[in-house]
């Protein structure tokens, strides 16, 4: 009987381990800054888009994501409001940050809240963690996070249901919480404002 209970406990521990390990690694840092390279691959593995930019993340729920190429755009969240600035159309769109991020795996990088993990099954292979939505009616694909044992996020990948992949690789990672001023956003003069928070 004791042997059976031990085996059962070990089985449950093994199932829970990847999710716990990923959460623990993310919790090692209050934030980071990095540059990123982006590759979008077709379901057949062909590169259809490349880009680069800069990212700043401070937990909980603060981030600045600036794409420099191929098209400039900026996402900034102060934890309450999410601003999306598109210089090409000279427009800033405002969203409620929590609502905008709630249904995306990206929220795990910025918030690492225990209840967020309930929506995903997590598999671990070395430093790569694959998250699959548990909801049968989810339209999300899979999400992979590469993070070292020291809590350094090296990149992530979004794998759509149709097989298309968007891969972001981080470099020049500065493992410390960015200054709060990085997440303060002022709408540029002369641009159109579309407030979607109502």
UniProtKB/Swiss-Prot annotation:
GO biological-process terms attached to the record: lipoprotein localization to outer membrane; lipoprotein transport
Annotated keywords: Chaperone, Periplasm, Protein transport, Signal, Transport
UniProt keyword Signal present: yes
Subcellular location, principal: periplasm
Pfam families in alphabetical order: LolA (PF03548)
GO CC field: outer membrane-bounded periplasmic space
Leader sequence residues: 1-16
Chain ranges passing through the membrane: none
Subcellular location: Periplasm
Purpose of the protein: Participates in the translocation of lipoproteins from the inner membrane to the outer membrane. Only forms a complex with a lipoprotein if the residue after the N-terminal Cys is not an aspartate (The Asp acts as a targeting signal to indicate that the lipoprotein should stay in the inner membrane).
Family as reported in the entry's similarity comment: Belongs to the LolA family.
Subunit structure comment from the entry: Monomer.
Protein name per the record: Outer-membrane lipoprotein carrier protein
